[in-house]
Amino acid sequence: MEAPPVTMMPVTGGTINMMEYLLQGSVLDHSLESLIHRLRGLCDNMEPETFVDHEMVFLLKGQQASPFVLRARRSLDRAGAPWHLRYLGQPEMGDKNRHALVRNCVDIATSENLTDFLMEMGFRMDHEFVARGHLFRKGIMKIVVYKIFRILVPGNTDNTEALSLSYLVELSVVAPAGQDMVSDDMRNFAEQLKPLVHLEKIDPKRLM
Amino acid sequence: MQREEKQLEASLDALLSQVADLKNSLGSFIYKLENEYDRLTWPSVLDSFALLSGQLNTLNKVLKHEKTPLFRNQVIIPLVLSPDRDEDLMRQTEGRVPVFSHEVVPDHLRTKPDPEVEEQEKQLTTDAARIGADAAQKQIQSLNKMCSNLLEKISKEERESESGGLRPNKQTFNPADTNALVAAVAFGKGLSNWRPSGSSGPSQPGQPGAGTVLAGASGLQQVQMAGAPNQQQPVLSGVQMAQAGQPGKMPSGIKTNIKSASMHPYQRPCFPDSSLAISPGYVTRPPGRDRPHLQLWR
């Protein structure tokens, strides 16, 4: 069963509903270097951070129509890093002025037996991929440039092939619900990356 | 007579002012060359030359003006030559001509060029006359043609280099790729989709259809799962997970309503319909754990 829309949920102490604001685009391989240079200039000054992550998407199919989706991610290049479990809700539609895709987001770190746990709960893995790329930050904005690799032999993360000749570029912010000025900041930042990359709000439903 | 005199005076004044301007710009150019030669750039020199050329042009225009009487018809005759210093003259010439004497007059009131220069000019004119009108015409034409060719080449080069700079040299992103990547991340389009249907191997990449599962959202395409071939899938419904923002809060508040299991013979033991705490004792390995696709997680 899908979680009810955020606006209907009563605020009953404890946690704040976090929303993820997202803008996506892509860049071809040969232009990656220029994009990285530009991001290094625009973003906060830190060591360039690369990452290799293995993400698995789990589905829980109920009697209802839509399955419940959880995303489990683990780092392939950082030993000892915790696994990361994420729930992403449906994109909130309606406000055409909002410049970013907004969806409910729940993030948590877990231990390594996450997959066992999920299987026991009845989740089944739907698909998996390896993401390899770079991470940048600017304030609360996170910019990730990564390439998606298809896993050819299930479970074997070494045997991968690239899905396309492009890198996916994502600009995301996780912020409490209701802070729409965040999307304005994101749009201003996205303007600075043109014409290398066009970051825009892409509705996944359109791409079914 | 009066009118002509007035015209003469007016044109003389105009000429004087033009010449004064020219003198000033020449002076500043020389100063620039002498004092700032190490910092001088070619565009700056070009600017000075352009200024000079502009002023010469206006001077020419003034001379050609219809109101200007022909100066050729005027003659300047020195009336008094004296070797004494003349203060007035000094003032007027800004200290350059102190004495109006025999040495100064031939230079300043000259109307013909130097004898050597005159000789050269005469020679050139005789050469030109010697060639003959036709040959001269041909030479003029070939010169014009070469000049125009050169100009054309230069302008073409300039145009090409400009357009080369303006043209975006290459596309830096591919919108189709963007869509493909977003679809892959959102719901696994193009990635190997795992179907726990017991059949071996990953489904063909890029095969949408029954196997395609969509990222969690209501109202999306329902995944058709036939009951019988899908073993060991107890039907769980109504899983609600508390919104836990920080690590460590995850285990709390998990309520599972577990309805009856599937009809398949290989099914888990039935649980009571109640809140279920996950305890070690509960976990029984469901049959088929050694199924190939599950061996991943060992």
Swiss-Prot record, chain A:
The lineage of its organism: Eukaryota, Metazoa, Chordata, Craniata, Vertebrata. Gene3D superfamilies: Hypothetical Protein Pfu-838710-001. The modification Phosphoserine is found at S66. This is Mediator of RNA polymerase II transcription subunit 18. Its main location: nucleus. Component of the Mediator complex, which is composed of MED1, MED4, MED6, MED7, MED8, MED9, MED10, MED11, MED12, MED13, MED13L, MED14, MED15, MED16, MED17, MED18, MED19, MED20, MED21, MED22, MED23, MED24, MED25, MED26, MED27, MED29, MED30, MED31, CCNC, CDK8 and CDC2L6/CDK11. The MED12, MED13, CCNC and CDK8 subunits form a distinct module termed the CDK8 module. Mediator containing the CDK8 module is less active than Mediator lacking this module in supporting transcriptional activation. GO terms for cellular component: core mediator complex; mediator complex. Component of the Mediator complex, a coactivator involved in the regulated transcription of nearly all RNA polymerase II-dependent genes. Mediator functions as a bridge to convey information from gene-specific regulatory proteins to the basal RNA polymerase II transcription machinery. Mediator is recruited to promoters by direct interactions with regulatory proteins and serves as a scaffold for the assembly of a functional preinitiation complex with RNA polymerase II and the general transcription factors. Signal peptide: none annotated. Keywords: Activator, Nucleus, Phosphoprotein, Transcription, Transcription regulation. It is found in: Nucleus. GO terms for molecular function: transcription coregulator activity. InterPro entries: Mediator_Med18. Belongs to the Mediator complex subunit 18 family. It holds the Pfam family Med18. GO terms for biological process: positive regulation of transcription initiation by RNA polymerase II.
